Regions:
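Conserved donor NDP-sugar-binding/catalytic core segment of glycosyltransferases
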Residues: 85, 89-122
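Conserved nucleotide-sugar donor-binding catalytic segment
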Residues: 122-208, 212
Length: 264
């Protein structure tokens, strides 16, 4: 089940739907959850038997996502925002094949890499999820296939305006003990530059990160992770990762590091 939530998305809704409908694997459904668009985007929305539209008022993107989850019938859920795309037309086919070859005994998450349209680079995800990965940088939400039951058991918390998906991921790792498997492929093309990346919301994001990590991680664990971040010049690395000029170099080095770890 692919969930797309929207409110006055303009032409971006159909861009995302076209990317989904182009998939060579036909076994999917699309849940479009609209919060009351008035820009004509719903009237001009693509029509397909696999697209299901639900219109209901909501107070935030995370409340809209929770509403959408109640309508899914698939075993796994992927969230795509309007403007985000599948990286190529084979993503679902390759993911389905991987899931068949690597089944999970428990409800878990399959995740992959992400192409950043903003910096024109591929963002590599770690081949193994650890506590430090949870503290530092989890895989992009648009590149994670969640077992639907994980989203039903633990709805997104609307009190977090920026990081409710991050809080949910940490719940999956620390509380649900959900298995997580790396797909080894690029799942989504992430548009970036949206609501969460404004100057004001970056400050809110940092505050929410502090609250959420304290909720799931022990003080000793937090101290260790913060020390590592300080010693490895985290602000400089972040600036490089977000720079269109240096992002490719940084992500290339990251990919090589992850590759060596995977080989071990």
């Amino acid at each position: 089940s692919i969930i797309v939530v929207c409110l006055n998305p303009g032409t971006k809704l159909n861009q995302t739907l076209d990317s989904i409908l182009a998939q060579t694997c036909p076994d999917f459904e699309v849940i479009v959850k609209d919060g009351g668009s008035r820009d004509g985007s719903i009237e001009s929305m693509r029509t397909d038997g696999r697209i299901h539209l639900y219109q209901e008022p909501d107070h935030s993107i995370y409340e809209a996502m929770n509403q959408a989850v109640s309508h899914v019938t698939g075993d796994y859920i992927l969230f795509l925002n309007c403007g985000d795309l599948f990286y190529d037309k084979e993503v679902l086919a390759h993911t389905a094949q991987f899931m068949e070859q690597h089944p999970m005994k428990l409800q878990g998450i399959y995740y992959g890499d992400t192409y950043s349209a903003k910096t024109d680079t591929k963002i590599s995800s770690p081949p193994r999820i650890t506590g430090f990965v949870c503290y530092r940088t989890i895989p992009c939400h648009q590149s994670c296939f969640y077992a639907a039951d994980l989203c039903r058991q633990k709805p997104y918390e609307p009190k977090y305006k920026i990081r409710a998906d991050y809080e949910h991921f940490l719940w999956c790792y620390y509380r649900a003990k959900a298995p997580m498997q790396y797909l080894g492929l690029t799942v989504s093309s992430y548009e970036g530059g949206g609501y969460s990346e404004t100057k004001e919301n970056l400050k809110r994001s940092a505050a929410e990160h502090k609250e959420i990590t304290a909720k799931y991680m022990k003080p000793v664990e937090l101290f260790r992770y913060r020390a590592v971040m300080a010693l490895t010049l985290a602000p400089l690395r972040t600036a490089m990762a977000e720079s269109r000029h240096f992002s490719a170099i940084y992500q290339g080095l990251t990919s090589k590091v992850y590759g060596r770890r995977q080989e071990k």
